[in-house]
Structure formats: C-alpha cells, structure tokens
Amino acid sequence: MSEAKIGLIDIETSPLRAHTWGLFDQNVGLNQIDREWTILSFCFKPLGASKKLTEYMDTAGDPLNDKAIVQRLWEIMHDYDFLIAQNGKRFDMRKMRARMILHDLPPPSPVRVIDTMLMARQVAAFTSNKLEWLSTYLSKIQKSKHKAFPGFELWSECLNDNPKAWAAMKKYNIPDVLSMEQVYLKLRPWVTGHPN
C-alpha cells in the first residue's frame, strides 16, 4: 500500500462587487452584483517537502481570469489524498469546487480535508483559532502582514493589476502555507485518532 499524499493549500479570492445604498445591514440582491468573485492566487506545498517545492500561482496580467489557476487546483485535488487548509472545510475547498463547477471541470478524485482551525478548536481552548494567532505561538514562521497595502487595499490593487500588489500577495500567501504546516505538525499529536 502506498503512502498517502498530503499537501497544504491556501487560496486568496477576489470580492464580489455590488451596488448598495448604505454601509450597514445591507441585503444585496442578485441584480445588484456586477462582478462575480474569482480565485486570485494560491499557494501549495507537499507536507514535509522542502520549501523549494512550494508552488505559488496568481492571475497577474488578467486578474479576473482564474481558469488556469482553477485547472491547477483541480490537478492538485485530483492527485492528493489529503489537503490541509486553515478554515479549509468552510472556505477553501468549497470556493475551489464552486469555481471548478463554473469552469465545467469534472469532479476530481475524492480528497479529505484536514482543517487546522477545526483541529485547534478540537484539542484546546486557544485565545483564537485564527492562523495569525496560532502561527504566532505554534510556528517559527508567522502569518505575514501586508503593510504596504493594508487591509482591503491589497485585494483592490491586485484587481487593478498593480505589480507591487501582486508581489505583496505572493509574500502574504506563501507564509500562510509555511506557518500552517508548522501549526499542523504541532497540533497533530494532540488529535485523537489522527495518524502521526
């Protein structure tokens, strides 16, 4: 029996663009949306592999065209038995599947999701289960901050195809996966029934 293929993944998505009449408690109708969300970038790394094998891909040059990214994500999902992701069950996997369906791709081979946020919640009562907190205390690599493009500005400038914003996105996306790997390895022995 061959060893299970396990990888770590993190995606960054663009926001929907919609028209509203206010800032708080808005109900946005479907006819108010004028731009669908897409996947802007992803980072992937096989568990335990050298940092040199970390893969990063983005939509620089054509920010709203995620077809190539979605195809590559499909290949990764099809090829791996387990994918580790922070908030992966609620966000990353569902978003990736949505884009795969919209791009008319067939379902990839079944992949099991290991969600580091749910692992943290299951084994302990940390102050926060966000990657920013977990990586500060459980990893030598911290979740990156994008100071040159604070808050939403990073996503906005990537959508404007600003090369400096894309460079910042890469510096933001890759450490998420590297720190998540260390968080996962720290939590794994604490999860009952989880293979070590």
What are these regions (language model features)?
Residues G22, R99, T127, L187-R188:
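Hydrophobic alpha-helical membrane context
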